[in-house]
């Protein structure tokens, strides 16, 4: 079936009707949706886009797009254009790329084309449970208001979610925003690509909660003027090439506004390679918090977070990398402690101001018994709601002088740093 035939079918369906694709694959597709309808499939239909344009252009209110494979062809997947009440759910939204350029795309040498989902002056849009990859923007907001972005996997784009001008009232919840592609080389200091979430041109009433924002060039980037109502809580932000979170030089806030960043696990960032490696979070020295490096009252104030360390360390000339904090920021550490449950078995508990840090996201840490000896044993621990249990094999204990050490990262390709040491009493050695 040709594009024109499909367009004619869509145009002939009454408002509030449905178009169900029955075929497996349709090629050279670029469709305009000008009435309130449902587009769906029960047979895993693939719509391969026309070269250098959109696959679907939604120009009517109350449109539902679900259960489709939507492949842009060096262009965009779905454009939502000046309408309201659009729902985009349970789709795979990919980009058909020139395979000869894949190495350049993955390294960031060549920028990716198109937008997976472009929200242009839209209102009340729901984007849920989609897989979006290999676009310049996974999700792009320009003039979009009251947008819900939940339960998506957004990966291998130049920007996972990007805020352009006049976007507001956005919920970004429970997404996997991972491996978004920047200049992962020694060429660039910071960006301008590869950000998990980029609030470059607007940041008004944005809630970022319970997401996994991992393995991006940078995790979260805030650079907009006159920001207000930004809340970043309960996220795992880890393994970024440079910082996990940056407040950049153009950032300003509206009168009375407070940037809330708390109960996140922001750790194991600044992994490189990059021209400059800093730490977990940063405030640009040329921005409004620049003087905070020398005046504590002028620092950016962040709430308590897990930074992959039990010791507050400000980065400096001789101290950068994972676990370090920008000197223009004041924050509070969420540390952990371990206690013995029974011989050989332990519980790790993270604490926020003396109470269990139950609002933390799930996070990974490591404990090593008798590190760097012939009885070394490594356990990977995933903490849930601020707690986890772990145990070591009895055969790896010495009769005396056993030590448990904690590491935020235990990767042969990354430097290791002990963040916790526990001398095991003889009463805790399993028999």
What are the residue ranges of the model-derived segments?
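Edge beta-strands of extracellular beta-sandwich domains
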Residues: 410-429
């Amino acid at each position: 079936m040709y594009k024109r035939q499909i367009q004619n079918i869509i145009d002939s369906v009454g408002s509030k009707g449905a178009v169900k694709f029955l075929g497996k694959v349709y090629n050279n597709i670029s469709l305009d949706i000008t009435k309130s309808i449902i587009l769906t499939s029960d047979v895993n239909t693939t719509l391969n886009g026309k070269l250098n344009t959109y696959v679907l252009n939604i120009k009517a209110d109350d449109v539902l797009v679900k259960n489709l494979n939507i492949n842009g062809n060096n262009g965009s997947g779905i454009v939502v254009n000046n309408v309201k009440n659009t729902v985009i759910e349970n789709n795979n939204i990919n980009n058909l790329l020139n395979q000869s350029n894949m190495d350049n795309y993955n390294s960031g040498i060549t920028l990716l084309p198109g937008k997976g989902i472009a929200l242009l002056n839209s209102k009340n849009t729901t984007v849920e449970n989609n897989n979006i990859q290999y676009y310049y923007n996974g999700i792009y907001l320009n003039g979009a208001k009251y947008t819900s972005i939940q339960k998506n996997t957004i990966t291998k784009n130049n920007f996972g979610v990007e805020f352009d001008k006049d976007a507001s009232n956005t919920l970004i919840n429970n997404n996997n925003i991972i491996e978004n592609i920047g200049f992962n080389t020694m060429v660039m200091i910071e960006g301008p690509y590869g950000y998990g979430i980029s609030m470059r041109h607007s940041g008004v009433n944005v809630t970022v909660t319970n997401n996994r924002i991992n393995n991006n060039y940078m995790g979260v980037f805030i650079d907009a003027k006159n920001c207000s109502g930004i809340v970043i809580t309960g996220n795992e932000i880890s393994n970024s090439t440079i910082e996990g979170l940056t407040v950049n030089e153009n950032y300003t806030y509206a009168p009375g506004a407070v940037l809330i960043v708390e109960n996140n696990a922001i750790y194991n960032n600044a992994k490189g390679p990059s021209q400059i490696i800093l730490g977990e979070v940063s405030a640009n020295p040329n921005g409004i918090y620049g003087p905070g490096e020398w005046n504590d009252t002028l620092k950016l104030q962040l709430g308590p977070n897990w930074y992959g360390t039990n010791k507050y360390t400000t980065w400096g000339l001789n101290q950068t990398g994972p676990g370090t904090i920008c000197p223009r920021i004041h924050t509070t550490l969420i540390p952990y402690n371990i206690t013995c449950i029974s011989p050989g078995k332990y519980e790790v508990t993270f604490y926020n101001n003396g109470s269990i840090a139950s609002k933390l996201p799930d996070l990974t840490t490591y404990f090593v018994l008798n590190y760097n000896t012939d009885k070394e044993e490594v356990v990977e621990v995933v903490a849930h709601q601020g707690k986890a249990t772990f145990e070591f094999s009895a055969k790896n204990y010495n009769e005396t002088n056993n030590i448990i050490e904690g590491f935020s990262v235990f990767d042969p390709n990354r430097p290791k740093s002990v963040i916790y040491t526990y001398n095991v009493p003889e009463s805790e050695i399993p028999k």
